[in-house]
């Protein structure tokens, strides 16, 4: 396994989580959604496995699910997080927890 790719995935993931957490508008989150897409493409290519049950022969890494969940949960509850800026979006917390767990390297 490429340790540089792992370090990059962690650093990019933490940076992305911070950006999602700081986003205050749907426009910002829409822009971040594209960043999430680019990040998950990298994660899937570097660390993904081919799903035997998928019709497509593509690699998939479970960390991708958590990245999309982070931006979607923040978007779905944006009004709440604007009123409560001291709280980290729960989807972002879950993404960071899974990122730090390293379970996605299996």
Predicted regions and their residues:
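Small side chains
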Residues: 9, 13, 17, 40, ...
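Short intrinsically disordered terminal tails
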Residues: 1-7, 101-106
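Short terminal alpha-helical segments
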Residues: 2-37
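Amphipathic, interaction-prone secondary-structure segments
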Residues: 34, 39-51, 60
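Charged, low-complexity interaction regions
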Residues: 19-32, 47-54, 75-83
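Amphipathic alpha-helical binding modules
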Residues: 62-106
């Amino acid at each position: 396994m490429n340790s540089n790719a792992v370090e990059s995935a962690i650093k990019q993931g933490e940076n992305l989580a911070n950006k999602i957490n700081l986003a205050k508008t749907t426009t910002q989150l829409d822009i971040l959604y594209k960043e999430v897409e680019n990040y998950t493409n990298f994660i899937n290519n570097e660390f993904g496995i081919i799903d035997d049950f998928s019709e497509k022969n593509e690699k998939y890494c479970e960390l991708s699910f958590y990245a999309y969940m982070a931006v979607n949960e923040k978007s779905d509850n944006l009004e709440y997080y604007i009123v409560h800026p001291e709280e980290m979006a729960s989807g972002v917390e879950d993404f960071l927890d899974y990122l730090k767990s390293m379970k996605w390297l299996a």
